[in-house]
């Protein structure tokens, strides 16, 4: 049966993630030994396995106590608290920073505004490593909200930033709440421009598609948000990590004429292409 397969614009690796992966591989070759990343370099199991095959391993912060002086630790694209970088350096470790420049920009804005007496509000997931890291640049004092519950006791003087992968509608909702309560507001819409374009693109795609596959790690924040957006417009939207999770029975439905494909920022092209090729085979 003839089907139309549409790949969303900006699907797959974003600038920050690609940069982090390239940096990790570059440093492994440069030092010629194991490279350690604080947490998985990106939220994609297939890519993590690929990196391990190239002597690049994810560890937790507590594991750095077991490393030797001169071992190489790479800060991933999500970034870390300011204090973490100092602690690693004090241990005699070689620290390489692959924090996404967009995240670094948020960290520096937060630090500056915090020092100027602003209460920091972060719109995002309090358990996400990017948000945890940003909070560390204001002495872990930020108010963190995902927009699902109303903010209470909002200070009069606030600085508002967002997780780079947050949904635009959540940002707008929280900002509207703050405007009603605070007298002095410095707001930086720090949603990554690529994230914004990606979300708008999948929203349009899911309106015209009969079936949508969102490809990316189940632990990937931005992929999950893309899936949520797709599901609103197209009930037949499915979040899969790779071609192995492609449910072929979904393609037996003769009413499915147009299939939309999108992918999170941690999904490499080869995983996307495998899914598209499989769909076209069936």
From Swiss-Prot:
One term of GO molecular function: 4 iron, 4 sulfur cluster binding
Disulfide bond found in the keyword field: no
Gene3D superfamilies recorded: 3.40.50.11270, 4-hydroxy-3-methylbut-2-enyl diphosphate reductase, catalytic domain
Pfam families named among the record's database cross-references: LYTB (PF02401)
Catalysis: reaction(s): isopentenyl diphosphate + 2 oxidized [2Fe-2S]-[ferredoxin] + H2O = (2E)-4-hydroxy-3-methylbut-2-enyl diphosphate + 2 reduced [2Fe-2S]-[ferredoxin] + 2 H(+); dimethylallyl diphosphate + 2 oxidized [2Fe-2S]-[ferredoxin] + H2O = (2E)-4-hydroxy-3-methylbut-2-enyl diphosphate + 2 reduced [2Fe-2S]-[ferredoxin] + 2 H(+)
GO biological process: dimethylallyl diphosphate biosynthetic process; isopentenyl diphosphate biosynthetic process, methylerythritol 4-phosphate pathway; terpenoid biosynthetic process
Keywords for this protein: 4Fe-4S, Iron, Iron-sulfur, Isoprene biosynthesis, Metal-binding, Oxidoreductase
Residues at which dimethylallyl diphosphate binds: 43, 78, 128, 220-222, 266
Binding sites annotated in the UniProt record for [4Fe-4S] cluster: 14, 100, 192
Top class in the EC scheme: oxidoreductase
Pathway(s): Isoprenoid biosynthesis; dimethylallyl diphosphate biosynthesis; dimethylallyl diphosphate from (2E)-4-hydroxy-3-methylbutenyl diphosphate: step 1/1; Isoprenoid biosynthesis; isopentenyl diphosphate biosynthesis via DXP pathway; isopentenyl diphosphate from 1-deoxy-D-xylulose 5-phosphate: step 6/6
Active-site residues per Swiss-Prot or TrEMBL entry: 130
Obligatory cofactor(s): [4Fe-4S] cluster
EC assignment: 1.17.7.4
Cofactor annotation comment: Binds 1 [4Fe-4S] cluster per subunit.
Positions that bind isopentenyl diphosphate: 43, 78, 128, 220-222, 266
Family of this protein: Belongs to the IspH family.
UniProt-recorded name of the protein: 4-hydroxy-3-methylbut-2-enyl diphosphate reductase
Gene name of this polypeptide: ispH
């Amino acid at each position: 049966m003839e089907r139309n397969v549409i790949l969303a614009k900006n699907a797959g690796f974003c600038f920050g993630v690609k940069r982090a992966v390239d940096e990790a591989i570059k440093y492994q070759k440069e030092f010629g030994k194991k490279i350690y990343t604080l947490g998985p370099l990106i939220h994609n199991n297939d890519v993590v396995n690929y990196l391990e095959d190239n002597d690049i391993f994810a560890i937790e912060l507590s594991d750095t106590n077991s490393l030797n002086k001169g071992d190489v630790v790479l800060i991933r694209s999500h970034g870390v608290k300011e204090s973490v970088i100092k602690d690693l350096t004090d241990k005699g470790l070689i620290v390489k920073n692959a924090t996404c420049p967009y995240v670094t920009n948020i960290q520096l804005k937060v630090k500056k505004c915090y020092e100027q007496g602003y209460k920091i509000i972060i719109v995002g997931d309090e358990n996400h490593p990017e948000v945890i890291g940003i909070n560390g640049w204001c002495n872990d004092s930020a108010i963190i909200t995902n927009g699902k519950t109303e903010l209470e006791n909002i200070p009069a003087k606030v600085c508002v930033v967002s997780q780079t992968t947050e949904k635009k509608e959540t940002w707008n909702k929280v900002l509207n709440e703050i405007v009603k309560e605070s007298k002095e507001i410095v707001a930086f819409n720090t949603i990554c421009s690529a994230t914004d374009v990606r979300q708008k693109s999948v929203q349009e795609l899911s309106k015209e598609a009969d079936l949508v596959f969102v490809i990316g790690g189940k632990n990937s924040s931005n992929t999950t948000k893309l899936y949520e957006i797709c599901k609103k417009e197209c009930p037949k939207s499915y979040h899969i990590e790779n071609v192995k999770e492609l449910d072929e029975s979904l393609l037996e439905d003769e009413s499915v004429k147009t299939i939309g494909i999108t992918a999170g920022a941690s999904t490499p092209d080869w995983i996307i292409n495998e899914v598209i090729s499989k769909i076209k085979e069936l």
